[in-house]
Amino acid sequence: MISFIIPCYNEEKHIRECIRSIKSNIQYIQYEIIVVDNNCSDDTAKIANEEQVTVIEEKRKGVVFARQAGYENAKGDLIANIDADSKITKGWVWVALKQILNDDVIAVTGPLEYENSSSSLKLLTKIFYWAANISNKYVGVFLQGGNSMIKKSALDAVNGYDLNIAFYGEDTMTAKRIQHLGKIVFEPDLISISSPRRINEQGLVKTIWLYLINYLSVTFKGKSLTNDYKDHR
């Protein structure tokens, strides 16, 4: 059984499409969708309920707390982490299962593609994920937090997520904590289409810099450098 976990903070503009992209991918597979209401003040929970999925609340603000709440309530043996402002692409589930059902694989992750992105952003995104794939093989493990599937047994072995990292680097820390249990595969065909809102509002250079320095810090020092983050809605 696959448990799809979607952390949400005021995602009324995106959550319906996100949920429906998951449902359209499911055939002949047991699954559940858990939307984690992380202090929403809009209609996110109402819309999720209309879509007939499980909605739970997590009052501690932050994506890592929402992921942990989803994991603790999940019934499946596979945990799929999906960002609320994303839509998984056709065939996503089967691409993920092809990798993660191997005995030596504990997690699979893939790239994000951004809606209505410029040619320069598309090029930089391709370069980023090329570098991420190289890093995953030779430097440090790479995990795209909002576009991944993890065996629940691997998370059970480390008691879930590290709650000391609020945002930047939380996915890298997850990868770092479970990597001794098996392989983490970067699968280029495991694509999720995401909103570019953070890049648009924060700027491309700053966004890349913040993710890069925190990835390196968590990989080599075991801690994040940036504790503060801004919600972009």
Where are these regions (language model features)?
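Acidic donor-binding loop at a coil-to-helix junction in glycosyltransferase catalytic cores
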Residues: 167-174
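Short, acidic, metal-binding catalytic loop of nucleotide-sugar glycosyltransferases
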Residues: 20-30
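Short aromatic/hydrophobic "clamp" motif used to bind/position activated sugar donors
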Residues: 79
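Conserved donor NDP-sugar-binding/catalytic core segment of glycosyltransferases
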Residues: 91-120
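Acidic helix N-cap motif at the loop->helix transition within catalytic regions
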Residues: 14-16, 42-50
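Glycine-rich, basic loop-to-helix element that forms the pyrophosphate-binding segment
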Residues: 58-74
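Short, flexible, basic/aromatic active-site loop/helix in glycosyltransferases
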Residues: 109-117, 121-145
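A conserved acidic beta->alpha catalytic loop
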Residues: 37-45, 86
